[in-house]
Every structure is written in structure tokens, then in C-alpha cells.
Regions:
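Non-catalytic, conserved peripheral segments adjacent to functional cores
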Residues: 17-121, 127-130, 134-137, 141-155
Length: 155
């Protein structure tokens, strides 16, 4: 088997796995990923905390974050840049309010032809809120410097 064939086989396996995940319920995803309730709404689990330091805190952190239908990520802001990554389920509507600028709406998802994007960047101190537009959405959030609840503020 050539290296390229192996890569294609792995890509096909990933596609099948992601397609299969769409048949899961939100509660099954929460259980399989061992997610816990998040104070802003939804469910999360920290998956990475960089051992490299940026001053007194970790250089970066990453979480899984899931919203069920009817749940919202309440308006909040953090003291660091946050990158949202779409992983599965329905698209997610992310709204960002930075200073006096109008609210920016980003649709996270995998359908580029419907203006969905696989990631979005929220600047430090920008207000943000999110909601799924289906049964559930699984995203990841990467924060740099690393997330600390001391730098988290709910509206």
C-alpha cells in the first residue's frame, strides 16, 4: 500500500466516523466525551492545558464545547483571544460584539457554499454568545493565553 493510499483510507475512515456521529444524540456525545455543565450554558471538557507559560498562566488551552437545542452560550467575554472550531452536529451561530462595532454573526459549520466557516476568532475582551441551529453542535475552543475563570465575565 502506498503512503497516499493509506492517507486516503484514513481520510475515508474519518469521514465515515464523522457521518456516524450525526446519528448520535446530544446526551450520547456528552457521555462519550465526558462533558460537564459549563457556567455560561452548554457542556464542556478541557482537553489541553499547555505546560509552556505566558507570564503566570498557560500559553494556551483547548476545550470541547457542546450546545443542545434550546441552550445558548450566554453573553460573556474573556481576557484572551478565543478561536472556535466546528467539529460536528448542526451549524452554530456565533455573535461577536467588539467595542462599539456592530455585532458580527458567524455561522460555524462545514457547508462553505452556505457561508458556513469551520472556525472563527473572537478578540480578547469582545462579548460573545452562541447557539446551535439544530439538535446539537460540538465545537472546540482554543484560548491563548490559556483560559482562566478569573478572566471570564458573564453579562
Amino acid at each position: 500500500m502506498s503512503c497516499l493510499t493509506g492517507v486516503r483510507a484514513k481520510a475515508d475512515l474519518f469521514a465515515v466516523t464523522m457521518a456516524d456521529s450525526d446519528s448520535l444524540t446530544a446526551d450520547e456525545v456528552i457521555r462519550l466525551l465526558a462533558l460537564a455543565v459549563h457556567p455560561e450554558g452548554g457542556y464542556y471538557r478541557e482537553t489541553f492545558r499547555d505546560s509552556t507559560k505566558a507570564g503566570e498562566r498557560s500559553a494556551s488551552t483547548a476545550i470541547y464545547f457542546l450546545l443542545k437545542q434550546g441552550q445558548i452560550s450566554r453573553w460573556h467575554r474573556i481576557d484572551a483571544v478565543e478561536v472556535w472550531h466546528w467539529y460536528g452536529g448542526a451549524p452554530l451561530r456565533l455573535q461577536i460584539r467588539n467595542a462599539e462595532e456592530p455585532i458580527e454573526t458567524v455561522l460555524l459549520g462545514n457547508n462553505l457554499l452556505k457561508n458556513e466557516r469551520p472556525q472563527a476568532v473572537v478578540p480578547a475582551q469582545a462579548w460573545q454568545t452562541a447557539e446551535t441551529i439544530g439538535a446539537w453542535t460540538l465545537v472546540g475552543c482554543t484560548v491563548a493565553p490559556g483560559f482562566e475563570f478569573a478572566g471570564f465575565e458573564l453579562a
